[in-house]
Curated annotation (Swiss-Prot):
It comes from Turnip crinkle virus (TCV). One of its GO terms (biological process) is transport of virus in host, cell to cell. This is Double gene block protein 1. Signal peptide: none annotated. The keyword Transport applies. Residues 19-33 have a biased composition (Basic residues).
């Protein structure tokens, strides 16, 4: 699923049955959304063949360990 189309309530504290999600499940979902969003942006930039003009990145996660290398 495209991260831009993931409904906001899919990141909520409860699932479709009303049961509360565990912390690990919420964190995993947030990491998945952030990862797909970053991949999507990088692929669009790469496919367009244009130079990067900067932008605003918002990553939502409980814990973040990231190593990112940009070669434009």
């Amino acid at each position: 699923m495209d991260p831009e189309r993931i409904p906001y309530n899919s990141l909520s504290d409860s699932d479709a049955t009303g049961k509360r999600k565990k912390g690990g499940e919420k964190s995993a979902k947030k990491r998945l959304v952030a990862s797909h969003a970053a991949s999507s942006v990088l692929n669009k930039k790469r496919n367009e063949g244009s130079a990067s003009h900067g932008g605003t990145w918002v990553i939502v996660a409980d814990k973040v360990e990231v190593s990112i290398n940009f070669n434009f």
